[in-house]
């Protein structure tokens, strides 16, 4: 009986760990900040968000650039039904979808550091058309933006 309880707890822990990793890698977690976090010093927005969301490369180095989109997730999901369907650069078998309207975004450009979390970013608010790939009519990955 005790062994069954231990096995159950191990499986329960393992399942939750896998689900946490899946949540951490979603487009919404990585790129959507709506409403935009109110960081007291706007110039520190990127540094705050990169640490809070644990944004880094798989080898734990700093990302050179990262974009946060300041729009409702529902509106971002609507990109997948956009008539602006184009071939993705470097992904020949996959189509990209471009938003029909410009979204407010913050571009975080690495200015200092190489290993996470010792990364420092420049904050640059902008607007642009968002490019995503879609899976089952939901954005799957953020590919960039067009001004």
From Swiss-Prot:
Name one cellular component (GO) term: extracellular region
What's the short name of a Pfam family annotated to this entry?
A: RnaseA
| UniProt GO BP | defense response to Gram-positive bacterium
**Which InterPro entries does this one have?**
RNaseA (IPR001427), RNaseA-like_dom_sf (IPR036816), RNaseA_domain (IPR023412)
Q: Which CDD domains does the protein's record reference?
A: RNase_A
The subcellular location is:
Secreted
Q: What stretches pass through the bilayer?
A: none
Highest taxon, organism lineage? Eukaryota
SUPFAM superfamilies in the cross-refs = RNase A-like
SMART domains with a match to the protein in the record: RNAse_Pc (SM00092)
> Which is one GO molecular function term here?
nucleic acid binding
Where does it mainly reside? secreted
Q: What is this protein called?
A: Probable inactive ribonuclease-like protein 12
Can you name the source organism? Answer: Homo sapiens
């Amino acid at each position: 009986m005790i062994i069954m309880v231990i096995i159950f707890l191990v499986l329960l822990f393992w399942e939750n760990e896998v689900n946490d990793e899946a949540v951490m890698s979603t487009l919404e977690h990585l790129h959507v900040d709506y409403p935009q976090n109110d960081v007291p010093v706007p110039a520190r927005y990127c540094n705050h968000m990169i640490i809070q969301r644990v944004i880094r490369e798989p080898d734990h180095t700093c990302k050179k650039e990262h974009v946060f989109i300041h729009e409702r997730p529902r509106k971002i999901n609507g990109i997948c039904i956009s008539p602006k369907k184009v071939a993705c650069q470097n992904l020949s078998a996959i189509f990209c979808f471009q938003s029909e309207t410009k979204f407010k975004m913050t571009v975080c450009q690495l200015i200092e550091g190489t290993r996470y979390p010792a990364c420092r970013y420049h904050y640059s608010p902008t607007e642009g058309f968002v490019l995503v790939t879609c899976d089952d009519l939901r954005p799957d990955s953020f590919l960039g933006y067009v001004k």
